[in-house]
Amino acid sequence: ITNGTAVLGLGNIGALAGKPVMEGKSMLFKVFADIDAFDIEVDATDTDRFVETVKAIAPTFGGINLEDIKAPECFEIENRLKEELDIPVMHDDQHGTAIISSAGLLNALEVAGKKIENVRIVVNGAGASATSCTKLYVALGARKENILMLDSKGVITSDRPNLTESKKFFATDRRDVHTLEEAIKGADVFLGLSKGNVLTQDMVCLLYTSPSPRDRT
């Protein structure tokens, strides 16, 4: 179920335009898990109205999968529905992306011979997917002090006013980094979950490199 306010790669395109994406996700549920899923598009950007709509139709279903709802509203919607419904509620942009991303990270670290508690991580993006992925990284052992998160204004620092709760969680006390280029220098991991074409070839060269030519290939 969606209101089409944050469709991947397209942004706020509205409920109707988001229908093909929901149909595709419903098909994946059936093909890979034999779960009968129905795509529902709700023309409601108001949080209260969206929550009440989902609650009203919930008796028909065994579970709710929230999809493509913009932050920070998506966090409140998920939390309220989990509290007020007696069926499973999942937000795919948060939990689905986080699980897949974390699996990839763990495999990459194993190949590179690195430990998650030691790597420096740069996260470009601070929406639902980015914050959920990074929280799961922390749960798996990554250290918050080794993480830099950026939004459209640059590195999220603890002295910045009017931060949302999700951004406060990952705000850094460092004052020596402001841009993506500065943040990425010497980092081990880059997670890109914002707009495309922001990571340049020069920035890739700033990432941590092993002294072994074999490891660099």
Q: How would you describe each model-predicted region?
A:
Residues 16-20, 103-183:
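Glycine-rich phosphate/diphosphate-binding loop of Rossmann-like nucleotide-binding domains
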Residues 208-217:
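Conserved small/polar residues in nucleotide/adenosyl-binding loops
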Residues 48, 167-204:
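A structured beta-alpha segment of the ubiquitous adenosine-cofactor-binding alpha/beta core
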